[in-house]
A protein has these predicted regions:
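Helix-loop-strand module that forms the ligand-binding subsite of alpha/beta enzymes
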Residues: 5-86
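Glycine-rich phosphate/pyrophosphate-binding loop and the adjoining helix
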Residues: 83-127
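Charged, glycine/proline-rich intrinsically disordered loops and linkers
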Residues: 1-3
């Protein structure tokens, strides 16, 4: 009803997301994915007419200002499912017409012996 009447007042998160210059998200790897609250956030920002829309030919129309989304993930063990995590986030970028998607991860942080600081610094140098 709100969208049908062009009333987007209930979609503040989506409006904010659509208007930022660059997006950086850092989250732990939990249960083969990201935290559930981050999933809820993604669901709240996927709003037709704010963060994406289709033209009369079914082609996506760019609505999000950002040109880059960077996702940083850490994990205590191996990231055995990183391909599906990457794929989901890449598809969000495609939906939002964000042309550049950077995906950085550091895994095995709970495996000893392990110099966590050195591994994090090495990953940060890739930015």
């Amino acid at each position: 009803m709100y969208i049908k009447n062009n009333n987007f007042s209930k979609y503040e998160q989506a409006i904010d997301f659509a208007n930022v210059d660059e997006i950086v998200i850092a989250a732990p790897y939990w249960d083969m994915s990201f935290p559930s609250l981050l999933k809820v956030y993604f669901e709240n920002i996927c709003v037709n007419g704010i963060t994406f829309e289709y033209d009369e030919n079914g082609k996506l129309v760019k609505k999000v200002k950002a040109k880059t989304l960077t996702y940083i993930v850490t994990s205590g063990g191996p990231l055995s499912n990183k391909s599906s995590l990457y794929s989901y986030l890449k598809e969000l970028c495609d939906l939002f017409s964000i042309p550049t998607f950077n995906f950085y991860y550091v895994d095995m942080l709970d495996v000893y012996p392990n110099d966590v600081c050195d591994r994090l610094i090495e990953t940060a140098k890739k930015f």
